[in-house]
Amino acid sequence: MIGTFNETKLAVTQKTSHSEVRLPTVCVAILNWRGIKYLPSLLSSLLSAVNKYPGECPIVVLDNNEGDDTDRTWIRQNFPTVRVIQAPANDYLYSYNWLLQQLTEQIVILLNNDLKVDENFLLPLVKHFTNPRVFAASSRSYDWEGKQVTSGPYLFRQHRGWFYCTPDLAKQFTCHTLFACGGHMAVDREKFLDIGGFDRLFYPAYGEDIDLGFRAWQKDWISVYEPESIVYHAQSGSWNEDTSDRKAEYMTLRSNFLFQWRNLDRFPFAWLHAVYLPWLRLRKLLDGDRVWLKAYGEAKAIWQQHLISNSNVNFKDRHLSKDLKRICGTKF
Protein backbone atom coordinates (compact mmCIF):
# COMPACT_ATOMS: atom_id res chain seq x y z
CA MET A 1 0.00 0.00 0.00
CA ILE A 2 1.17 3.51 -0.73
CA GLY A 3 1.12 5.79 2.29
CA THR A 4 -0.42 9.22 1.73
CA PHE A 5 -2.11 11.79 3.92
CA ASN A 6 -5.72 12.79 4.30
CA GLU A 7 -6.49 16.26 3.05
CA THR A 8 -7.70 18.91 5.47
CA LYS A 9 -8.20 22.53 4.56
CA LEU A 10 -5.28 24.63 5.71
CA ALA A 11 -4.51 28.28 5.08
CA VAL A 12 -1.29 28.45 3.09
CA THR A 13 -0.79 32.16 3.56
CA GLN A 14 -2.70 35.22 4.64
CA LYS A 15 -5.55 36.24 2.33
CA THR A 16 -4.52 39.84 1.82
CA SER A 17 -3.88 41.69 -1.39
CA HIS A 18 -0.43 43.12 -2.03
CA SER A 19 -1.90 46.61 -1.83
CA GLU A 20 -2.82 46.04 1.85
CA VAL A 21 0.56 44.79 3.03
CA ARG A 22 4.14 45.77 2.44
CA LEU A 23 5.90 43.27 0.21
CA PRO A 24 9.31 42.02 1.34
CA THR A 25 12.44 43.00 -0.55
CA VAL A 26 13.28 40.53 -3.30
CA CYS A 27 15.88 39.70 -5.91
CA VAL A 28 16.31 36.97 -8.51
CA ALA A 29 19.46 34.82 -8.51
CA ILE A 30 20.25 32.73 -11.59
CA LEU A 31 22.78 29.92 -11.32
CA ASN A 32 24.75 29.73 -14.56
CA TRP A 33 27.29 27.35 -16.01
CA ARG A 34 27.86 27.64 -19.76
CA GLY A 35 24.25 28.64 -20.17
CA ILE A 36 24.53 30.87 -23.21
CA LYS A 37 22.06 28.64 -25.08
CA TYR A 38 19.16 29.60 -22.79
CA LEU A 39 20.26 32.86 -21.15
CA PRO A 40 18.84 35.13 -23.90
CA SER A 41 15.34 33.68 -23.40
CA LEU A 42 15.57 33.69 -19.63
CA LEU A 43 16.94 37.20 -19.19
CA SER A 44 14.60 38.75 -21.75
CA SER A 45 11.53 37.17 -20.17
CA LEU A 46 12.74 37.97 -16.67
CA LEU A 47 13.24 41.65 -17.47
CA SER A 48 9.64 41.76 -18.72
CA ALA A 49 8.50 40.21 -15.45
CA VAL A 50 10.54 42.67 -13.40
CA ASN A 51 8.99 45.57 -15.31
CA LYS A 52 5.48 44.35 -14.36
CA TYR A 53 6.34 43.74 -10.71
CA PRO A 54 5.07 46.50 -8.36
CA GLY A 55 8.41 46.84 -6.55
CA GLU A 56 12.16 46.68 -7.01
CA CYS A 57 13.63 43.33 -8.06
CA PRO A 58 17.30 43.26 -9.07
CA ILE A 59 18.62 40.33 -11.11
CA VAL A 60 21.86 38.56 -10.21
CA VAL A 61 23.62 35.93 -12.31
CA LEU A 62 25.88 33.67 -10.26
CA ASP A 63 28.37 32.27 -12.74
CA ASN A 64 29.94 28.93 -11.82
CA ASN A 65 32.31 28.91 -14.79
CA GLU A 66 35.69 29.72 -13.27
CA GLY A 67 38.03 29.61 -16.23
CA ASP A 68 35.92 31.09 -19.03
CA ASP A 69 34.38 34.56 -18.89
CA THR A 70 32.44 34.21 -22.16
CA ASP A 71 29.02 34.17 -20.50
CA ARG A 72 29.89 36.97 -18.09
CA THR A 73 31.10 39.19 -20.92
CA TRP A 74 28.03 38.46 -23.03
CA ILE A 75 25.64 39.28 -20.17
CA ARG A 76 27.36 42.57 -19.39
CA GLN A 77 27.24 43.61 -23.04
CA ASN A 78 23.64 42.60 -23.73
CA PHE A 79 21.96 43.01 -20.32
CA PRO A 80 23.88 45.79 -18.55
CA THR A 81 21.31 46.09 -15.75
CA VAL A 82 21.93 42.50 -14.69
CA ARG A 83 24.54 42.06 -11.96
CA VAL A 84 27.07 39.30 -12.65
CA ILE A 85 28.92 37.61 -9.80
CA GLN A 86 31.58 34.97 -10.29
CA ALA A 87 31.32 32.14 -7.77
CA PRO A 88 34.50 31.34 -5.81
CA ALA A 89 34.43 27.86 -7.37
CA ASN A 90 32.15 25.68 -9.47
CA ASP A 91 30.25 24.22 -6.54
CA TYR A 92 27.09 23.32 -8.46
CA LEU A 93 23.98 24.70 -6.77
CA TYR A 94 25.84 24.78 -3.45
CA SER A 95 27.23 28.09 -4.69
CA TYR A 96 23.84 29.43 -3.57
CA ASN A 97 24.87 28.81 0.04
CA TRP A 98 27.71 31.29 -0.48
CA LEU A 99 25.68 33.78 -2.51
CA LEU A 100 22.81 34.13 -0.05
CA GLN A 101 25.31 35.15 2.61
CA GLN A 102 26.36 38.05 0.35
CA LEU A 103 22.87 39.29 -0.51
CA THR A 104 20.66 41.48 1.68
CA GLU A 105 17.16 41.03 0.22
CA GLN A 106 14.60 39.23 2.37
CA ILE A 107 13.43 36.92 -0.43
CA VAL A 108 15.66 35.38 -3.09
CA ILE A 109 14.18 33.65 -6.12
CA LEU A 110 16.51 30.87 -7.28
CA LEU A 111 16.37 29.98 -10.97
CA ASN A 112 18.17 27.51 -13.19
CA ASN A 113 19.51 28.99 -16.41
CA ASP A 114 17.43 26.64 -18.60
CA LEU A 115 14.14 28.48 -18.01
CA LYS A 116 12.03 31.28 -19.33
CA VAL A 117 9.36 32.94 -17.21
CA ASP A 118 5.88 34.36 -17.64
CA GLU A 119 5.60 38.14 -17.34
CA ASN A 120 3.41 37.72 -14.24
CA PHE A 121 5.86 35.29 -12.66
CA LEU A 122 7.02 37.33 -9.65
CA LEU A 123 4.12 38.65 -7.58
CA PRO A 124 2.28 35.32 -7.03
CA LEU A 125 5.45 33.96 -5.39
CA VAL A 126 6.47 36.99 -3.37
CA LYS A 127 3.02 37.66 -1.88
CA HIS A 128 3.19 34.46 0.18
CA PHE A 129 6.05 35.81 2.24
CA THR A 130 3.78 38.31 3.97
CA ASN A 131 3.07 35.24 6.11
CA PRO A 132 6.07 34.82 8.46
CA ARG A 133 5.67 31.03 8.47
CA VAL A 134 6.36 30.68 4.76
CA PHE A 135 9.80 29.29 4.01
CA ALA A 136 9.62 28.76 0.25
CA ALA A 137 7.29 28.97 -2.74
CA SER A 138 7.56 27.13 -6.03
CA SER A 139 6.20 27.97 -9.49
CA ARG A 140 4.15 25.90 -11.89
CA SER A 141 6.37 24.64 -14.71
CA TYR A 142 5.55 23.76 -18.30
CA ASP A 143 7.71 22.17 -20.94
CA TRP A 144 9.64 24.61 -23.14
CA GLU A 145 6.82 24.85 -25.69
CA GLY A 146 4.20 25.49 -23.00
CA LYS A 147 2.10 22.48 -23.99
CA GLN A 148 2.39 20.26 -20.94
CA VAL A 149 2.34 20.95 -17.19
CA THR A 150 5.33 19.27 -15.57
CA SER A 151 4.89 20.29 -11.93
CA GLY A 152 2.54 20.02 -9.00
CA PRO A 153 2.75 19.86 -5.21
CA TYR A 154 5.10 17.15 -4.02
CA LEU A 155 3.57 14.66 -1.62
CA PHE A 156 5.37 12.29 0.72
CA ARG A 157 4.93 8.61 -0.10
CA GLN A 158 6.39 5.37 1.21
CA HIS A 159 5.81 2.02 -0.48
CA ARG A 160 7.18 -1.10 1.18
CA GLY A 161 9.75 0.91 3.07
CA TRP A 162 10.88 2.95 0.07
CA PHE A 163 10.51 6.73 0.22
CA TYR A 164 9.68 8.63 -2.93
CA CYS A 165 7.82 11.76 -3.91
CA THR A 166 6.26 12.73 -7.20
CA PRO A 167 4.41 15.86 -8.27
CA ASP A 168 0.63 15.59 -8.21
CA LEU A 169 -0.11 17.13 -11.61
CA ALA A 170 -3.85 17.17 -10.91
CA LYS A 171 -3.53 19.64 -8.03
CA GLN A 172 -3.13 22.93 -9.87
CA PHE A 173 -4.12 25.21 -7.04
CA THR A 174 -2.25 27.00 -4.26
CA CYS A 175 -1.34 24.40 -1.67
CA HIS A 176 1.28 22.99 0.64
CA THR A 177 4.11 20.95 -0.84
CA LEU A 178 6.81 18.78 0.71
CA PHE A 179 9.40 21.05 -0.89
CA ALA A 180 9.81 23.83 -3.42
CA CYS A 181 11.63 22.77 -6.58
CA GLY A 182 15.21 24.04 -6.39
CA GLY A 183 15.23 25.02 -10.05
CA HIS A 184 12.53 27.67 -9.63
CA MET A 185 11.85 28.57 -6.03
CA ALA A 186 11.51 31.68 -3.91
CA VAL A 187 12.99 31.32 -0.44
CA ASP A 188 13.21 33.37 2.73
CA ARG A 189 16.93 34.17 2.82
CA GLU A 190 17.32 34.31 6.61
CA LYS A 191 15.43 31.06 7.13
CA PHE A 192 17.50 29.40 4.38
CA LEU A 193 20.72 30.40 6.12
CA ASP A 194 19.33 29.52 9.55
CA ILE A 195 18.92 25.86 8.62
CA GLY A 196 22.26 25.71 6.82
CA GLY A 197 21.16 26.01 3.20
CA PHE A 198 21.51 23.05 0.86
CA ASP A 199 23.12 20.10 2.63
CA ARG A 200 26.31 18.84 0.99
CA LEU A 201 25.32 15.29 1.90
CA PHE A 202 23.53 15.32 -1.49
CA TYR A 203 26.45 16.73 -3.49
CA PRO A 204 26.61 17.29 -6.43
CA ALA A 205 22.85 17.29 -7.09
CA TYR A 206 19.41 15.70 -6.71
CA GLY A 207 17.53 15.53 -3.44
CA GLU A 208 19.00 18.62 -1.81
CA ASP A 209 15.79 20.61 -2.32
CA ILE A 210 13.67 17.78 -0.87
CA ASP A 211 15.86 17.69 2.21
CA LEU A 212 15.80 21.49 2.51
CA GLY A 213 12.00 21.60 2.43
CA PHE A 214 11.70 18.75 4.91
CA ARG A 215 14.05 20.43 7.38
CA ALA A 216 12.02 23.63 7.05
CA TRP A 217 8.86 21.71 7.95
CA GLN A 218 10.70 20.47 11.04
CA LYS A 219 10.97 24.14 12.05
CA ASP A 220 7.23 24.60 11.40
CA TRP A 221 7.99 26.61 8.24
CA ILE A 222 5.80 25.85 5.26
CA SER A 223 6.49 25.46 1.55
CA VAL A 224 3.88 26.47 -1.01
CA TYR A 225 3.10 25.42 -4.57
CA GLU A 226 1.86 28.46 -6.50
CA PRO A 227 0.49 27.69 -10.01
CA GLU A 228 -0.20 31.36 -10.83
CA SER A 229 3.57 31.82 -11.10
CA ILE A 230 4.65 30.14 -14.34
CA VAL A 231 8.00 29.06 -15.79
CA TYR A 232 8.94 27.10 -18.90
CA HIS A 233 11.69 24.53 -18.49
CA ALA A 234 14.06 22.93 -20.99
CA GLN A 235 14.42 19.61 -19.18
CA SER A 236 18.02 19.04 -17.95
CA GLY A 237 19.20 21.95 -20.06
CA SER A 238 21.48 23.18 -17.28
CA TRP A 239 23.37 19.87 -17.20
CA ASN A 240 26.00 18.59 -19.58
CA GLU A 241 24.62 17.10 -22.76
CA ASP A 242 26.32 13.81 -21.88
CA THR A 243 24.32 13.45 -18.65
CA SER A 244 22.35 10.32 -19.47
CA ASP A 245 18.97 9.24 -18.13
CA ARG A 246 20.71 6.36 -16.37
CA LYS A 247 23.06 8.73 -14.58
CA ALA A 248 20.13 10.91 -13.52
CA GLU A 249 18.31 7.78 -12.29
CA TYR A 250 21.38 6.71 -10.33
CA MET A 251 21.79 10.12 -8.67
CA THR A 252 18.09 10.25 -7.79
CA LEU A 253 18.19 6.77 -6.23
CA ARG A 254 21.31 7.61 -4.25
CA SER A 255 19.69 10.78 -2.92
CA ASN A 256 16.51 8.90 -1.98
CA PHE A 257 18.55 6.55 0.19
CA LEU A 258 20.36 9.44 1.84
CA PHE A 259 17.16 11.39 2.45
CA GLN A 260 15.49 8.39 4.06
CA TRP A 261 18.43 7.56 6.31
CA ARG A 262 18.92 11.18 7.32
CA ASN A 263 15.33 12.18 7.97
CA LEU A 264 13.04 9.17 8.35
CA ASP A 265 14.64 7.53 11.36
CA ARG A 266 11.46 7.09 13.40
CA PHE A 267 8.67 4.52 13.52
CA PRO A 268 7.01 3.52 11.27
CA PHE A 269 9.18 4.86 8.45
CA ALA A 270 12.55 3.47 9.57
CA TRP A 271 10.96 0.17 10.63
CA LEU A 272 9.33 -0.39 7.24
CA HIS A 273 12.56 0.50 5.47
CA ALA A 274 14.60 -1.92 7.60
CA VAL A 275 12.11 -4.75 7.00
CA TYR A 276 11.83 -4.37 3.24
CA LEU A 277 15.36 -3.27 2.27
CA PRO A 278 16.98 -6.77 2.34
CA TRP A 279 14.16 -8.14 0.18
CA LEU A 280 14.43 -5.22 -2.23
CA ARG A 281 18.21 -5.57 -2.49
CA LEU A 282 17.91 -9.30 -3.22
CA ARG A 283 15.37 -8.61 -5.95
CA LYS A 284 17.65 -6.02 -7.54
CA LEU A 285 20.55 -8.48 -7.42
CA LEU A 286 18.49 -11.15 -9.17
CA ASP A 287 17.29 -8.60 -11.74
CA GLY A 288 20.84 -7.42 -12.39
CA ASP A 289 19.85 -3.80 -11.73
CA ARG A 290 23.33 -2.28 -11.71
CA VAL A 291 22.09 1.30 -11.43
CA TRP A 292 20.14 0.58 -8.24
CA LEU A 293 22.95 -1.49 -6.71
CA LYS A 294 25.55 1.16 -7.48
CA ALA A 295 23.35 3.89 -6.00
CA TYR A 296 22.79 1.83 -2.85
CA GLY A 297 26.49 1.07 -2.44
CA GLU A 298 27.62 4.66 -2.84
CA ALA A 299 24.82 6.02 -0.65
CA LYS A 300 25.79 3.58 2.10
CA ALA A 301 29.43 4.69 1.95
CA ILE A 302 28.47 8.38 1.99
CA TRP A 303 26.10 7.83 4.89
CA GLN A 304 28.66 5.97 6.98
CA GLN A 305 31.11 8.82 6.52
CA HIS A 306 28.37 11.32 7.36
CA LEU A 307 27.65 9.53 10.64
CA ILE A 308 31.32 9.69 11.58
CA SER A 309 31.54 13.40 10.75
CA ASN A 310 28.26 14.30 12.49
CA SER A 311 28.27 12.04 15.52
CA ASN A 312 27.16 14.91 17.77
CA VAL A 313 23.96 15.73 15.83
CA ASN A 314 20.79 15.06 17.83
CA PHE A 315 17.39 14.67 16.16
CA LYS A 316 15.50 13.24 19.15
CA ASP A 317 13.06 16.13 19.38
CA ARG A 318 11.49 15.59 15.96
CA HIS A 319 7.91 14.37 15.59
CA LEU A 320 7.83 12.96 12.10
CA SER A 321 4.23 11.80 11.89
CA LYS A 322 2.90 15.17 13.02
CA ASP A 323 5.13 17.01 10.56
CA LEU A 324 4.41 14.82 7.59
CA LYS A 325 0.64 14.91 8.00
CA ARG A 326 0.79 18.62 7.24
CA ILE A 327 2.57 18.06 3.95
CA CYS A 328 -0.39 16.90 1.95
CA GLY A 329 -1.18 19.25 -0.95
CA THR A 330 -4.11 20.89 0.80
CA LYS A 331 -6.26 23.42 -1.02
CA PHE A 332 -5.95 27.12 -0.21
Regions inferred by a protein language model and the residue ranges of each:
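A short, conserved alpha-helix in the catalytic core of glycosyltransferases
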Residues: 178-196, 201-230
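Short, well-formed alpha-helical segments that are part of the catalytic scaffolds
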Residues: 35-50
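Short aromatic/hydrophobic "clamp" motif used to bind/position activated sugar donors
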Residues: 108
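Conserved donor NDP-sugar-binding/catalytic core segment of glycosyltransferases
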Residues: 116-155
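Non-catalytic, C-terminal membrane-associated alpha-helical segments of glycosyltransferases
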Residues: 31, 266-332
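Glycine-rich, basic loop-to-helix element that forms the pyrophosphate-binding segment
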Residues: 86-103
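Short, flexible, basic/aromatic active-site loop/helix in glycosyltransferases
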Residues: 157-177
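Acidic donor-binding segment of Leloir-type glycosyltransferases
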Residues: 46-86
